[in-house]
Swiss-Prot record:
Pfam families hit by this protein: AraA_central, AraA_N, Arabinose_Iso_C
GO cellular component terms attached to this protein's record: cytosol
Protein name (record): L-arabinose isomerase
Recorded coiled-coil stretches: none
Length: 501
């Protein structure tokens, strides 16, 4: 099924029952669970569901869960107790399971046949309490899981499963992600630092560091013919500032920007890296801070973090993977400054250069402007304004004893006025529930100033991702009440291990 967004992945559908009811019932369970899988696949799930034979005993369950854990293509398991499946049989299997779990609380029939219902029907269709038995053991074992309730034909059920699958795809990709840091983090900045060993333990991502001189060698080795081809692509794809066109006064700067992109692409490809960071304080032999190169690489799905921010680079990569095939975009972002007019408080988000063009449906303009930081030549960048759309803004921070996700839903809006003198790509948004509550809660949670902003996924995928990755989540949305949020954060702080100071 190569038309799926994730043809390389699959999720397994496990049905629980027992031999108490006889072979005819087990045959019916198998037929009906297969029909559910076929219906869900036909409903447009992003990851193919694979039906597995009905499970009736502890040995079979443990083997199936162990097999799922050992199968790279399997990124998650959906469990459903069609009849009553005594949950002690699931204990060892659930303890062996190392893949995300979704508990689907559904049944084969949409309605009850009131006039003909008998005990044969009742014995076959008893997920109402069979799933409660399974739920008890999952809760007793504290298994991270998502519970979806409703008939499998319900569009809301399909959307919930699809969101969970997308989160599972993001986590599966992250567990094989290799990230390269070109240089270290920005000097004296706290939130971009962190425990890279803990991140690999928790998320599975390998984080490696190379000197910027290694990238500089690649830049020097780029063939001029390859630069010619990429420059032609730039000229065709973007509204080019006249000074950057062939024969223009700054055309050589565009050619050097193309060299940076080609060098970065080859380095990432050869090292099997799918995320990377740069740092304007550590540019070595590079003549420009990479701008258009980073923007185009993000547009192709690479994760990125500025100033050595590897946590945000991993997060951008994960969210881009979750959003594969969806409208909208995902980008590295930074809350830059506020519009505090009481009638409409807004955030203006941007960065020096590096905002992903997937956030706009317009043709970006390719420009060159001075950059005060870095002490290098003026960098080439794409300039645009993000399209109005619902969005979620997510940050990942190291709290010392755990990793925390902080997320805020928002509405991207058009700027109240044009921005003719702002030489960078940008987004303007109204955070939920409003700026005062959102910013106060974000700061109280220790949320970072670098984030992944997405108009493609929602808080639903982020919540599922946090749970399956074992990350603490602080979600700020339209339902957030400030005092309650602050009280919850303070209560969390009181449960942390005692500090040495």
């Amino acid at each position: 099924m190569t038309d799926l967004p994730y043809p390389e992945y699959e999720c397994w559908f496990l049905t629980g029952s027992q031999h108490l009811y006889g072979e005819d019932v087990l045959s019916a369970v198998a037929r009906q669970s297969q029909a559910i899988v076929e219906a869900l696949n036909a409903a447009g799930l992003p990851v193919r569901l694979v039906w597995k034979p009905v499970l009736t005993d502890a040995t079979g369950i443990r083997r199936m869960c162990s097999e799922a854990s050992a199968t790279d293509a399997c990124i998650g398991v959906i469990a459903w107790m069609h009849t009553f499946s005594p949950a002690k049989a699931w204990i060892n299997g659930l303890l062996a399971l190392r893949k995300p779990l979704l508990h689907l609380h559904t049944q084969a029939n949409l309605t009850l046949p009131w006039s003909t219902i008998d005990m044969d029907f009742m014995n076959l269709n008893q997920a109402a309490h069979g799933d409660r038995e399974f739920g008890y053991v999952a809760a007793r074992l504290a298994i991270p899981r998502k519970i979806v309730t409703g008939h499998f034909s319900d569009p809301d059920v399909v959307r919930d499963i699809a969101a969970w699958q997308r989160a599972a795809a993001g986590l599966a990709d992250l567990r094989s992600t290799r990230l390269v840091r070109f240089g270290d983090t920005m000097r004296n900045v706290a939130v971009t630092d962190g425990d890279r060993v803990e991140a690999q333990i928790r998320l599975g991502s390998a984080i490696e560091t190379y000197g910027v001189h290694d990238l500089g060698v690649r830049v020097d080795a780029v063939a001029e013919s390859d630069v010619d081809a990429l420059v032609d692509r730039y000229l065709a794809d973007y509204d080019m500032a006249p000074e950057l066109t062939i024969g223009g006064a700054r055309h050589e700067s565009l050619r050097y920007a193309a060299k940076l992109e080609l060098a970065l692409r080859s380095f990432l490809h050869d090292g099997r890296f799918t995320a990377f960071t740069t740092n304007f304080e550590d540019l070595g032999p590079l003549r420009q801070l990479p701008g258009i190169a980073v923007q185009r690489l993000m547009a192709d799905g690479f994760g990125f973090g500025a100033e050595g921010d590897w946590k945000t680079a991993l997060l951008v990569r994960a969210v881009k993977t979750m959003s594969r095939g969806l409208p909208g975009g995902t980008s590295f972002m930074e809350d830059y400054t506020y519009h505090l007019e009481p009638s409409g408080r807004l955030v203006l988000g941007a960065h020096m250069l590096e905002v992903c063009p997937t956030l706009t449906s317009a043709t970006p303009r390719c420009e060159i402007h001075p950059l005060l930081m870095g002490g290098r030549e003026d960098p080439v960048r794409l300039v645009f304004t993000a399209d109005p759309a619902p969005a979620v803004i997510v940050g990942l921070c190291d709290m010392g004893d755990r990793l925390r996700l902080v997320a805020n839903t928002a509405d991207l809006v058009a700027p109240p006025e044009p921005l003719p003198r702002l030489p960078v790509a940008r987004a303007v948004w109204q955070p939920h529930p409003e700026l005062k509550t959102a910013a106060t809660a974000w700061i109280a949670a220790g949320g970072p100033h670098h984030t992944a902003l997405s108009t493609a996924v929602s808080a639903r995928e982020i919540r599922d991702f946090a749970r399956m990755a074992g990350l603490e989540l602080v979600l700020i949305d339209e339902h957030t009440a400030l005092d309650a949020a602050l009280d919850r954060l303070w209560a969390i702080e009181q449960t942390r291990a005692s500090r040495p100071w």
